[in-house]
């Protein structure tokens, strides 16, 4: 963990960094130590020709099984995606359908939360700053490959509450085009053993 924080300090300007940079490092340390989290989410998945909106209840665990239960639209409410290790499956009314291992290069609404949390914990911080989202001040953290130019490859933007450190929103982009957007409410961290 110390190495990850030192590398992050380098990209954020090192000692004497701004308030936003220090806040980003504090949040990263907290997310590295967390055992899990719960939240409600609104997810938009944009596949170019098709856009899907979902309401989702999330229970994510660092160890063991995580669950994403669809709450909207009504015609698929109750469908639950379960994630454990490298395995994912869908479950509804007791029936279970295997979907096979997650593809490391693939991205779907089901895999978006683990991807967002991975960026929060270990993603290269390309930029961070305080900005206004709606009517509140938030911390925005932009992550991407350190060798990539902005707008190329996969990028991630994360917005955090500066007081509670709750994840408020996350966006995943591919080549400058936002493909997944998650807006979180009631985000609660479960501290790790050291927390």
Question: Residues of each region from the PLM?
Answer:
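Short, exposed beta-strand/loop patches in secreted or surface proteins that constitute
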Residues: 29-31, 56-61, 81-82, 123-132, ...
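Gly/Pro-enriched, hydrophobic low-complexity segments
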Residues: 69, 127-195
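One face of beta-strands
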Residues: 37-43, 52-70, 79, 88, ...
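N-terminal leader/targeting segments and the immediate start of mature chains
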Residues: 8-56, 60, 65, 191-195
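Flexible, processing/modification-adjacent segments and terminal tails
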Residues: 32, 41, 45, 90-149
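An acidic-aromatic
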Residues: 60-112
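Short, cysteine-centered beta-strand-loop-beta hairpins and adjacent loop/turn segments enriched
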Residues: 46-51, 73-77, 147-152
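Sec-dependent N-terminal signal peptides
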Residues: 1-4
């Amino acid at each position: 963990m110390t190495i990850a924080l030192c590398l992050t300090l380098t990209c954020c300007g090192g000692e004497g960094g701004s308030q936003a940079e220090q806040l980003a490092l504090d949040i990263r340390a907290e997310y590295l130590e967390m055992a899990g989290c719960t939240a409600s989410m609104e997810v938009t998945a944009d596949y170019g020709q098709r856009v899907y909106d979902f309401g989702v209840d999330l229970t994510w665990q660092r160890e063991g099984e995580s669950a994403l239960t669809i709450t909207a639209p009504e015609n698929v409410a109750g469908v639950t995606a379960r994630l454990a290790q490298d395995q994912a499956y869908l479950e509804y009314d007791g029936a279970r359908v295997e979907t096979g291992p997650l593809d490391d290069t693939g991205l779907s609404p089901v895999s978006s939360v683990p991807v967002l949390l991975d960026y929060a914990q270990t993603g290269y911080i390309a930029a961070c700053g305080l900005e206004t989202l709606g009517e509140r001040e938030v911390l925005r953290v932009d992550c991407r490959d350190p060798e990539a130019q902005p707008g190329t490859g996969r990028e991630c933007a994360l917005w955090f509450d500066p007081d509670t450190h709750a994840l408020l929103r996350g966006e995943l982009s591919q080549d400058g085009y936002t493909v997944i957007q998650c807006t979180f409410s009631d985000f609660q961290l479960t501290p790790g053993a050291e927390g």
